Protein backbone atom coordinates (compact mmCIF):
# COMPACT_ATOMS: atom_id res chain seq x y z
CA UNK A 1 0.00 0.00 0.00
CA UNK A 2 2.80 2.40 0.95
CA UNK A 3 4.72 1.70 -2.25
CA UNK A 4 1.66 2.20 -4.42
CA UNK A 5 0.65 5.41 -2.67
CA UNK A 6 4.14 6.86 -2.85
CA UNK A 7 4.47 5.91 -6.52
CA UNK A 8 1.57 8.32 -7.11
CA UNK A 9 3.10 11.06 -4.96
CA UNK A 10 0.64 10.57 -2.12
CA UNK A 11 1.35 11.12 1.55
CA UNK A 12 0.84 7.98 3.65
CA UNK A 13 -0.71 8.29 7.12
CA UNK A 14 -0.87 5.55 9.76
CA UNK A 15 -3.79 5.58 12.16
CA UNK A 16 -1.86 4.30 15.15
CA UNK A 17 -4.84 3.94 17.50
CA UNK A 18 -3.84 0.29 18.06
CA UNK A 19 -0.15 0.66 17.23
CA UNK A 20 0.99 -0.07 20.77
CA UNK A 21 -1.13 -3.24 20.86
CA UNK A 22 0.65 -4.38 17.69
CA UNK A 23 4.00 -3.56 19.32
CA UNK A 24 3.05 -5.65 22.36
CA UNK A 25 1.97 -8.56 20.15
CA UNK A 26 4.95 -8.62 17.79
CA UNK A 27 7.81 -6.96 19.65
CA UNK A 28 8.38 -4.76 16.60
CA UNK A 29 9.12 -1.18 17.64
CA UNK A 30 6.73 1.69 16.89
CA UNK A 31 9.54 3.32 14.93
CA UNK A 32 9.80 0.27 12.66
CA UNK A 33 6.06 0.15 12.05
CA UNK A 34 6.02 3.85 11.15
CA UNK A 35 9.30 3.89 9.22
CA UNK A 36 7.77 4.00 5.75
CA UNK A 37 4.84 6.32 6.43
CA UNK A 38 4.84 10.09 6.39
CA UNK A 39 2.65 10.68 9.43
CA UNK A 40 1.36 8.66 12.37
CA UNK A 41 -1.27 9.30 15.02
CA UNK A 42 -1.06 7.60 18.41
CA UNK A 43 -4.05 7.79 20.74
CA UNK A 44 -3.34 7.74 24.48
CA UNK A 45 -6.95 7.19 25.55
CA UNK A 46 -7.53 3.79 23.97
CA UNK A 47 -5.30 1.01 25.28
CA UNK A 48 -3.16 3.27 27.45
CA UNK A 49 -6.11 4.55 29.45
CA UNK A 50 -5.31 8.27 29.53
CA UNK A 51 -8.43 10.43 29.88
CA UNK A 52 -7.75 11.91 26.44
CA UNK A 53 -4.85 12.92 24.26
CA UNK A 54 -2.95 11.87 21.20
CA UNK A 55 0.24 12.60 19.31
CA UNK A 56 0.51 13.39 15.62
CA UNK A 57 4.02 12.83 14.30
CA UNK A 58 5.61 13.59 10.96
CA UNK A 59 8.23 15.80 9.40
CA UNK A 60 8.97 19.17 11.01
CA UNK A 61 7.32 20.93 8.06
CA UNK A 62 4.21 18.77 8.30
CA UNK A 63 3.93 19.35 12.06
CA UNK A 64 4.24 23.12 11.60
CA UNK A 65 1.45 23.02 9.00
CA UNK A 66 -0.71 20.79 11.20
CA UNK A 67 -0.18 23.15 14.14
CA UNK A 68 -1.24 26.14 12.05
CA UNK A 69 -4.35 24.31 10.81
CA UNK A 70 -5.23 23.27 14.34
CA UNK A 71 -5.01 26.88 15.53
CA UNK A 72 -6.96 28.19 12.52
CA UNK A 73 -9.78 25.72 13.22
CA UNK A 74 -9.99 26.66 16.89
CA UNK A 75 -8.09 23.66 18.19
CA UNK A 76 -6.12 25.59 20.79
CA UNK A 77 -6.39 24.16 24.26
CA UNK A 78 -5.40 26.05 27.38
CA UNK A 79 -3.78 24.48 30.42
CA UNK A 80 -3.26 21.18 28.61
CA UNK A 81 -0.27 20.25 30.77
CA UNK A 82 -2.49 18.26 33.12
CA UNK A 83 -3.67 16.10 30.23
CA UNK A 84 -0.12 15.80 28.90
CA UNK A 85 0.93 14.57 32.35
CA UNK A 86 -1.79 11.91 32.19
CA UNK A 87 -0.47 10.79 28.79
CA UNK A 88 3.09 10.59 30.11
CA UNK A 89 1.83 8.60 33.10
CA UNK A 90 0.01 6.22 30.74
CA UNK A 91 3.17 5.72 28.65
CA UNK A 92 5.25 5.11 31.77
CA UNK A 93 2.79 2.81 33.53
CA UNK A 94 0.39 1.15 31.08
CA UNK A 95 2.59 -0.22 28.28
CA UNK A 96 2.50 -3.74 29.76
CA UNK A 97 -1.28 -3.51 29.74
CA UNK A 98 -1.22 -3.85 25.95
CA UNK A 99 -0.07 -7.48 26.23
CA UNK A 100 -2.66 -8.18 28.92
CA UNK A 101 -5.38 -6.72 26.67
CA UNK A 102 -4.18 -8.80 23.71
CA UNK A 103 -4.12 -12.01 25.77
CA UNK A 104 -7.57 -11.34 27.21
CA UNK A 105 -8.98 -10.72 23.72
CA UNK A 106 -7.49 -14.02 22.54
CA UNK A 107 -9.07 -15.83 25.50
CA UNK A 108 -12.47 -14.24 24.94
CA UNK A 109 -12.27 -14.89 21.21
CA UNK A 110 -11.49 -18.59 21.74
CA UNK A 111 -14.71 -18.93 23.75
CA UNK A 112 -16.92 -16.79 21.51
CA UNK A 113 -15.97 -18.67 18.34
CA UNK A 114 -17.27 -21.88 19.96
CA UNK A 115 -20.78 -20.47 20.50
CA UNK A 116 -23.38 -22.19 18.28
CA UNK A 117 -24.70 -19.12 16.43
CA UNK A 118 -21.27 -17.65 15.70
CA UNK A 119 -20.47 -18.10 12.01
CA UNK A 120 -16.85 -16.98 11.90
CA UNK A 121 -14.30 -14.70 13.48
CA UNK A 122 -11.47 -12.62 12.15
CA UNK A 123 -8.06 -13.60 13.56
CA UNK A 124 -7.63 -12.07 17.02
CA UNK A 125 -4.17 -10.57 16.64
CA UNK A 126 -4.37 -7.78 19.20
CA UNK A 127 -7.14 -6.50 21.48
CA UNK A 128 -9.96 -6.46 18.91
CA UNK A 129 -12.40 -9.30 18.34
CA UNK A 130 -14.70 -9.16 15.30
CA UNK A 131 -17.13 -12.00 14.68
CA UNK A 132 -20.23 -12.74 12.63
CA UNK A 133 -23.40 -14.49 13.65
CA UNK A 134 -25.30 -16.89 11.40
CA UNK A 135 -28.26 -15.58 9.34
CA UNK A 136 -30.92 -17.10 11.61
CA UNK A 137 -29.39 -15.57 14.76
CA UNK A 138 -30.60 -12.23 16.08
CA UNK A 139 -29.08 -9.30 14.18
CA UNK A 140 -26.02 -7.55 15.55
CA UNK A 141 -28.17 -4.59 16.62
CA UNK A 142 -30.58 -6.90 18.47
CA UNK A 143 -27.68 -8.62 20.22
CA UNK A 144 -26.21 -5.26 21.23
CA UNK A 145 -29.60 -4.14 22.62
CA UNK A 146 -30.13 -7.38 24.55
CA UNK A 147 -26.64 -7.21 26.03
CA UNK A 148 -27.10 -3.55 26.94
CA UNK A 149 -30.18 -4.55 28.96
CA UNK A 150 -27.80 -6.83 30.88
CA UNK A 151 -25.27 -3.97 31.36
CA UNK A 152 -22.83 -5.45 28.85
CA UNK A 153 -21.62 -3.16 26.09
CA UNK A 154 -20.66 -4.52 22.70
CA UNK A 155 -20.50 -2.85 19.31
CA UNK A 156 -22.40 -3.75 16.15
CA UNK A 157 -19.98 -3.77 13.25
CA UNK A 158 -22.48 -4.42 10.47
CA UNK A 159 -25.79 -6.26 10.17
CA UNK A 160 -24.36 -9.57 11.40
CA UNK A 161 -20.94 -8.55 12.74
CA UNK A 162 -20.02 -7.62 16.28
CA UNK A 163 -16.89 -6.07 17.73
CA UNK A 164 -15.33 -6.44 21.17
CA UNK A 165 -12.34 -4.39 22.28
CA UNK A 166 -10.39 -5.17 25.43
CA UNK A 167 -8.62 -2.36 27.24
CA UNK A 168 -7.41 -1.19 30.62
CA UNK A 169 -11.00 -1.11 31.92
CA UNK A 170 -11.83 -4.68 30.89
CA UNK A 171 -10.51 -7.40 33.18
CA UNK A 172 -10.85 -11.18 33.09
CA UNK A 173 -14.02 -11.07 35.18
CA UNK A 174 -15.63 -8.70 32.66
CA UNK A 175 -14.51 -10.98 29.83
CA UNK A 176 -16.08 -13.98 31.55
CA UNK A 177 -19.30 -12.04 32.07
CA UNK A 178 -19.38 -10.99 28.42
CA UNK A 179 -19.05 -14.59 27.25
CA UNK A 180 -21.70 -15.79 29.73
CA UNK A 181 -24.19 -13.07 28.76
CA UNK A 182 -23.49 -13.53 25.05
CA UNK A 183 -24.10 -17.27 25.47
CA UNK A 184 -27.47 -16.49 27.09
CA UNK A 185 -28.47 -13.94 24.45
CA UNK A 186 -27.55 -16.26 21.59
CA UNK A 187 -29.51 -19.11 23.19
CA UNK A 188 -32.81 -17.19 23.29
Question: Positions of the model-derived regions?
Answer:
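Conserved PLP-enzyme active-site core in the AAT-like
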Residues: 1-122, 126-150, 155-170, 174, ...
Amino acid sequence: VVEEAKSHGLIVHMDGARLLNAVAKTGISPERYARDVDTVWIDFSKGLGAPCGAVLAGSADFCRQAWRQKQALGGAMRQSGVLAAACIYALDNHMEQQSIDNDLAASIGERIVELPLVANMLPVDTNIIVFDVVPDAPTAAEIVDRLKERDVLLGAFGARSLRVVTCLNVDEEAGNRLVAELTTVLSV
